[in-house]
């Protein structure tokens, strides 16, 4: 009503040079409002706990303790990590569940990948549901998933790291202003992305592959969350591309055809519903390209695996199958070489190294890289039978030297 003042809790991203301050009420405060809330478990056997992080224009979360309002004293080591208020909320729900039965589901109402390893490892939490920022109407879909009216088929679009601040991108992140910059101008800062392509899964999966292959000093303590040798399982809670369903699926990569003349990679994948309820699945096609002495010498950056494309199935009934065809852009196999001559008479070109190209499908980037490593006779938990290969005999700097619109790169 007019003239009425309403206080509400709204989690927002701080300004670029600001710190994150939790605006959630403490569990003690909520108990004081309704001390009998736990009795609701007598009538309803599922408790939903929502943890949120929003986003805003010209706002960001500074990595690590530098991005947290220390005066709140909430035992928070990163703005995207849990605070004591959030831990208390989850633990209160778990305690109520243990007293009255039922289940606890934590929903992530967020715009940023959070640090949720302690939720994952909490035996009292039965499920974690990533809902993102669906808006008011989108929550009808969330309700359908929670009730079983709909079968989830989404997959993570980012790596959920144990400690965000340990990645190269976070270490390099900051608000670096020009000397004598005009503070009223919104272009008074820059950031040199020294990490190159190694952000998200391209960092975590590449470093993991290097640890398996014993190369690049990848198992050093630098960037380790434990202070010990770097270990993938200590650094990643959930990998890029990971997702769950109320049923199970089996994917089989039947064939891959690379057509450089038409700039396409075409894959056929059989998807079978091996569970008890109907559902949709997502086919993710990954490639692993040769990493040669030339690349090392010329500092060509390559990821251990690269997502080429993906496709969702139709609704598949239990026991039924569907063949999915994915046609990807072959340029996504190429790597940028900053010193290679191009057709404009300068340097900088997309290249394909000669050697073996691996293709695979999987429930996320980590499953994909393990499939490739298994095909390379490494002792990992991967399926080498779900890998197809393609050989390129000669170094190729011409296939993608001109764009599909005939412009020189």
What are these regions (language model features)?
Residues 1-409:
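C-terminal non-catalytic regions of proteins with extracellular/luminal or membrane-system context
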């Amino acid at each position: 009503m007019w003239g009425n003042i309403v206080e509400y809790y709204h989690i927002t991203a701080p300004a670029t040079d600001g710190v994150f301050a939790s605006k959630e009420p403490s569990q003690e405060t909520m108990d004081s409002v309704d001390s009998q809330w736990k009795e609701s478990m007598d009538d309803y056997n599922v408790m939903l706990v929502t943890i949120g992080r929003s986003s805003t224009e010209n706002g960001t979360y500074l990595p690590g303790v530098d991005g947290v309002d220390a005066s709140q004293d909430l035992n928070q080591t990163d703005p995207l990590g849990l605070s004591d208020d959030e831990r208390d909320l989850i633990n209160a729900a778990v305690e109520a569940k243990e007293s009255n039965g039922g289940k606890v589901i934590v929903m992530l109402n967020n715009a940023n990948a959070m640090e949720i390893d302690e939720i994952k490892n909490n035996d009292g939490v039965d499920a974690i549901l990533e809902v993102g920022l669906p808006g008011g109407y989108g929550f009808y879909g969330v309700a359908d998933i929670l009730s079983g009216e709909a079968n989830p088929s989404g997959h993570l679009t980012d790596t959920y790291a144990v400690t965000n601040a340990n990645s190269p991108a976070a270490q390099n992140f900051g608000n670096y202003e020009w000397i004598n910059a005009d503070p009223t101008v919104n272009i008074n800062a820059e950031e040199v992305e020294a990490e190159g392509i190694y952000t998200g899964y391209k960092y975590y999966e590449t470093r993991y592959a290097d640890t398996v292959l014993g190369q690049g000093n990848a198992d050093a303590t630098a960037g380790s969350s434990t202070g010990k040798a770097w270990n993938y399982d200590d650094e990643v809670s959930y990998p890029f591309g990971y997702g769950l369903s109320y049923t199970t699926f089996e994917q089989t990569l039947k064939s891959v055809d690379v057509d450089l003349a038409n700039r396409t990679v075409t894959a056929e994948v059989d998807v079978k519903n091996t569970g008890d309820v109907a559902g949709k699945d997502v086919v993710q096609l990954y490639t692993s390209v040769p990493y040669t002495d030339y690349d090392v010498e010329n500092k060509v950056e390559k990821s251990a695996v690269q997502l080429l494309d993906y496709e969702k199935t139709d609704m598949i009934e239990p026991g039924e199958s569907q063949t999915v065809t994915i046609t990807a852009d072959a340029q996504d196999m190429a790597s940028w070489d900053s010193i290679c001559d191009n057709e404009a008479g300068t340097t900088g070109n997309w290249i394909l190294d000669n050697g073996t190209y691996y293709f695979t499908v999987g429930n996320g980037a980590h499953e994909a890289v393990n499939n490739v490593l298994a095909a390379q006779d490494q002792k990992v938990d991967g399926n080498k039978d779900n890998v197809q290969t393609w050989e390129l005999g000669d170094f190729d700097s011409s296939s993608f030297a001109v764009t599909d619109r005939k412009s020189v790169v």
